[in-house]
């Protein structure tokens, strides 16, 4: 089929390349001329394992990019994959979505055939039906069900494994209002269903599909926070939390996924999505106490880590290496990274900070241009008084003699990845 994707960030670029891999002809529409040029040159604008190969393979063939909305006219369906950042009260900012919906509607006004518009961005329930659909209707002169269909297809992509997550999904959620919309969605995803071995396809309503995404992320975020809360309790009793969590993960009712206790969750999804659904629930008069508790536990983990360091010395004037700047391994994304909170607190306390990450250094440099950055973990550790491990990159598990170059050889491990060794003042966060 002929597909168009509005937005070429982490989600937009990934789904565009993956749809091309499935045999669809895809045009990526974006207002950023540099990103458009990069995609057309076969260069992925983001770091994501496997994505660069797909973009290079299909650019100029089944995958192209443009700033011109008119190219949407030759496509059968448009996916909206635009950012929905958090506002000060936690609710989502729909500015980019509204602008794109209006521009899309103005374009579709010149199309005679029916067109399907699919919300891919994470939005709270009723957004597609009450905000996006009416905006497209107003600008296009069309009506939903008469020349225009709307749908919701939430993404469940994890940064660092997004390509694999798309091509090997646990489930595919299709939210729509009309039979024609369901039929078009089914045709779009038919190659994926066949390739992935017939994963469950959930056919549901639009608002239900929107809520499924939030419920999914809220559950996972809460599971991590519960693991951290249990691990914090283990620590005060001198109990090995890793053994406890590994054991309960063997229970089929619980499972081992997302039981890795440590510094907590960050990134572009969990913080934003938990804040958004909490704000949306409060706007409807409901206080989501359990979900708020999960956020509170998560927010407290970096401070607990800093307390372990403060127990050893006054931070003022000390050189502290922060190992890992990305919010998780496998990505260069620093959004809501735990390292940001650690670095800011260290600077506020008068510490001298050196950061290291195998891929995210340049992104963090934009946030903290005045701290030092090392080209390797070994360089970061040299002459440091302490090290804080913030991201569980595999290379940190292999560190050994590199610690000998530290002055005081204090290591506080937020991810339980460093191997204990003689001569280290080592403590894990949990």
Curated annotation (Swiss-Prot):
Pfam families: UDPG_MGDP_dh, UDPG_MGDP_dh_C, UDPG_MGDP_dh_N. SUPFAM superfamilies: 6-phosphogluconate dehydrogenase C-terminal domain-like, NAD(P)-binding Rossmann-fold domains, UDP-glucose/GDP-mannose dehydrogenase C-terminal domain. Keywords: NAD, Oxidoreductase. InterPro entries: 6-PGluconate_DH-like_C_sf, NAD(P)-bd_dom_sf, UDP-Glc/GDP-Man, UDP-Glc/GDP-Man_DH_C, UDP-Glc/GDP-Man_DH_C_sf, UDP-Glc/GDP-Man_DH_dimer, UDP-Glc/GDP-Man_DH_N, UDPGDh_AglM. Its EC number is 1.1.1.22. Pathway: Nucleotide-sugar biosynthesis; UDP-alpha-D-glucuronate biosynthesis; UDP-alpha-D-glucuronate from UDP-alpha-D-glucose: step 1/1; Cell surface structure biogenesis; S-layer biogenesis. One of its GO terms (molecular function) is NAD binding. Disruption phenotype: Mutants exhibit defective or limited motility. Activity improves as salinity decreases. GO terms for biological process: polysaccharide biosynthetic process; S-layer organization; UDP-glucuronate biosynthetic process. It comes from the Archaea. Signal peptide: none annotated. The active site is at residue 269. Disulfide bonds: none annotated. It catalyses: UDP-alpha-D-glucose + 2 NAD(+) + H2O = UDP-alpha-D-glucuronate + 2 NADH + 3 H(+). Involved in the assembly of a N-linked pentasaccharide that decorates the S-layer glycoprotein and flagellins. Involved in the biosynthesis of the hexuronic acids found at both positions 2 and 3 of the pentasaccharide. Belongs to the UDP-glucose/GDP-mannose dehydrogenase family. This is UDP-glucose 6-dehydrogenase AglM. It comes from Haloferax volcanii (strain ATCC 29605 / DSM 3757 / JCM 8879 / NBRC 14742 / NCIMB 2012 / VKM B-1768 / DS2) (Halobacterium volcanii). The lineage of its organism: Archaea, Methanobacteriati, Methanobacteriota, Stenosarchaea group, Halobacteria. The gene is aglM.
